[in-house]
Amino acid sequence: MCSTCANVLKYYDWDPHFKLVINPNNFLSVGFCSNPLMCCYPELLPEFGTVWDCDRSPLEIYLESILGDDEWASTFDAVDPVVPPMHWGAAGKIFQPHPGVLMHHLIGKVAAGWDPDLPLIRLEADDGSITAPEQGTMVGGVIAEPSAQMSTAADMATGKSVDSEWEAFFSFHTSVNWSTSETQGKILFKQSLGPLLNPYLEHLAKLYVAWSGSIEVRFSISGSGVFGGKLAAIVVPPGVDPVQSTSMLQYPHVLFDARQVEPVIFCLPDLRSTLYHLMSDTDTTSLVIMVYNDLINPYANDANSSGCIVTVETKPGPDFKFHLLKPPGSMLTHGSIPSDLIPKTSSLWIGNRYWSDITDFVIRPFVFQANRHFDFNQETAGWSTPRFRPISVTITEQNGAKLGIGVATDYIVPGIPDGWPDTTIPGELIPAGDYAITNGTGNDITTATGYDTADIIKNNTNFRGMYICGSLQRAWGDKKISNTAFITTATLDGDNNNKINPCNTIDQSKIVVFQDNHVGKKAQTSDDTLALLGYTGIGEQAIGSDRDRVVRISTLPETGARGGNHPIFYKNSIKLGYVIRSIDVFNSQILHTSRQLSLNHYLLPPDSFAVYRIIDSNGSWFDIGIDSDGFSFVGVSGFGKLEFPLSASYMGIQLAKIRLASNIRSPMTKL
């Protein structure tokens, strides 16, 4: 023990010959680092205690340890702390742990060797005014009961959580569609044990670091007596990935019939080898609902399947507890619940490819986009931030040139301007002249009627497929007003660099700008601020629908169907040049989703969806699932006509191999 540490102990009337040593790294269980508090997570060190350097004065350390005590702050009475400073030999420092942290660590070590055969003392309140009858049939005996001893040990180590009346009743968790087309072994629902199973637990989980205990689940079937069929509720132990096979029925399970009137209740136990789970722990007991016998409806036929709805409700089990209280604003290192990826009203939805409002959804076999698309690792394969603002470039030209390469002045990827659009031109162009839009007979289209009734629209414009930008163009000595700019990603070619060729990969040499910058014979450098306003691709298919024209740096993120769920684009539109019309734009994400994924680390397994229920003004609804790559999926094959505005609500986490639920009303005609 160093002399400083020994002298500090004298002030507490402790024997300085005692060697009080400590290693705070033992408070933080990190398998990949042996010194996490000095290496990977130094910002967490103040949560465990106070650190002093050994070259500090012993009296100064003593006074600081007293002044930091809550007793001094309230009464100004100097009280020696319960735990004195100790020697942290590996770091060469003096460390004083918080008493609660040290006690939690010591009791945790004791509880690790807990003997479940020891007698327990049960304390119960004598107030029986809060009661809740069990409205259902309790099923038990098929699985091991939760360990009350483990729960008691966890409480002793971390503190008792708050009791409340919400623990006594079942709360809605989700609903599952069960149709006559689902075959035996089909998984309809899968959810890992954890606070996400119950809305109250999910809310309270924001105040804690860890949890433990079981959850009771109640199933209700909305079918009628004409139905036949059975479902199996299966308890899958940690570490096992559910598969769509009847082999899953070898695990503990209970059966419930489609004709059953009373709900079925059973307990989902917490099978664990530790005192508690951190909020990041997804390897827990799983609840799986699987088709045991096919659903039968004698009034259905091959052309028209029917079904019923299974409602899932939950409440915490008697042994469920939260542990390790934390301030609400503290961020956990493992990630948070993905409950805020879609705004609650569609009035706030704009695309991540263009900034107009989302007006529809488009189901496609494949969905792809690199720029401004983010995944659950906060990563993007693109070059733009999740916001829309003017693009900033400089352009150097001479000899009267109007076509040049922009140099980025605002960027996150060197050389590529932040916000640069992500599609290329359809073919080789020599930008010049005016718009040239004709019909099938070669006549110019000059009216709305002529455009809407044209059997063929030919776009012979020499700058077609480029984006139209309002421009603030400045150059020293240039007194003329700014002109409209046309921009794209392409390669510059030709004898006088007057030709551009399409290219779907981007770098600093492909930032093409077509604009009259009033350039003479001498070289002129213009500072350009460009606001994206329109598009010259008159008569083209939707922007972003052609994979070969979508620009990427190197990798193009892409997805296809998953488990009967289809990927979707979010559709909005951009104004066309010349004709007073618009063209559709396909977006891989709502811009709010892109922004949230870029700013926050969310917790989502790669085999699961974060599910949101979308409801239109007529009451039709369907679920959208967002996977860990940031793409969106639906379980329907078509939407029909949705009545905007739409509303969105977070439904929880669902296995990606399970078809997403929907209830879209058929269009009705009144004679």
Curated annotation (Swiss-Prot):
Protein source organism: Feline calicivirus (strain F9)
Check the record and name the Pfam families matching this protein: Calici_coat
User: What is the protein named?
Assistant: Capsid protein VP1
Q: Which InterPro entries does this entry report, sorted A to Z?
A: Calicivirus_coat, Rhv-like, Viral_coat
Q: Name the gene that codes for it.
A: CPP76
Of which family is this protein a member? Belongs to the caliciviridae capsid protein family.
Q: Where is this site: Cleavage?
A: 124-125
- In chain numbering, the residues marked as site (Interaction with host receptor F11R/JAM-1) are 479-480
- Keyword hit for Disulfide bond: yes
